[in-house]
């Protein structure tokens, strides 16, 4: 790791501004999955042990950036944080302004303060407003720590602009260090072979960069979900009313051509579950891709033979990376394909198995397989960008390591 890490700082009796990623799923005021909060705890505990005053900042959801919206308040996070820390955690009513400055002034060494949602202000996401917003945030701390791996592919103020105000004093947190070192070592530098990547999700265009990068790394590329139908249509298959990105068809053909040149095996679904609508009670059937999907039906999950083929390849692999569900996992029975992939990864302890955050991580959690996977990343988009480029904007601006 060529960036400064939190262990290289001297934060005793100092204020440390920590960017965390507490963008957790919330329903009716309750957090459904707190893995992102749990993942940040090692850094928070480390700083508290060093008698630092810890100032946490995060975003949650997609508020309009026009001020406080109760729906997106970080208040539900406070209860979970307090449970892990065993003491009261004040929530500043805002992240900037007089109330925030007062809250920061009152925080003492060995305690934690959580600032309210960064995205309540346009300064977090809009570059033209970054300077003033970042200047105020950076005034709160003596040191800056980025532990928000899942957000570090975005050039937002708290991730990209703020650390530049801390020359020699901005560092990666323990979660960030773990993510970069695991993904870098096992997927980029020296993956054990055979190396298989599984990509799902809807759009080819949004993942074309990482797909082309993976074609230089992997032995097998398994494609499913909406993306899979775009590739199938590019091969002239009848996909009925399935989700297809028409503008991605040429990209798919390019990928298929490059894969052939590089001797990478691309594997697409050979059968799929189809129905007239994506609802739990809908009547569904399985059809083979060679047979073709009728025009009034859409593919919603991979079929039984595809599951068997995918799992056969996974079982024969030494490194597996999975990003994106292979079906509409939110709606049973179209979750069966994704659940089968999760269980297949879990029963392969001798392999390095990496789940690239986002929906795939949610599937693994639903399947109860998280503990059996080598690494579940806290960042979907961030893990893809790191695999594509080998770096993230939010880490490039951190101070160089002194070691």
Curated annotation (Swiss-Prot):
Binding site for ATP: 207, 299, 330, 357-360
Gene3D superfamilies linked: Phosphoglycerate kinase, N-terminal domain (3.40.50.1260)
Annotated Pfam families: PGK (PF00162)
UniProt keyword annotations, A-Z: ATP-binding, Cytoplasm, Glycolysis, Kinase, Nucleotide-binding, Transferase
Catalytic activity as recorded in UniProt: (2R)-3-phosphoglycerate + ATP = (2R)-3-phospho-glyceroyl phosphate + ADP
Pathway: Carbohydrate degradation; glycolysis; pyruvate from D-glyceraldehyde 3-phosphate: step 2/5
SUPFAM superfamilies the record matches: Phosphoglycerate kinase
Major location (coarse): cytoplasm
Leading EC class: transferase
Any GO molecular function: phosphoglycerate kinase activity
GO CC list: cytosol
Gene Ontology BP annotations: gluconeogenesis; glycolytic process
UniProt binding sites for substrate: 21-23, 36, 59-62, 119, 154
Protein origin, superkingdom: Bacteria
InterPro entries according to UniProt: Phosphoglycerate_kinase (IPR001576), Phosphoglycerate_kinase_CS (IPR015911), Phosphoglycerate_kinase_N (IPR015824), Phosphoglycerate_kinase_sf (IPR036043)
UniProt-annotated location(s): Cytoplasm
EC annotation from Swiss-Prot or TrEMBL: 2.7.2.3
Quaternary structure note: Monomer.
Family statement: Belongs to the phosphoglycerate kinase family.
Protein name: Phosphoglycerate kinase
Species for this entry: Chlamydia abortus (strain DSM 27085 / S26/3) (Chlamydophila abortus)
Lineage start: Bacteria, Pseudomonadati, Chlamydiota, Chlamydiia, Chlamydiales
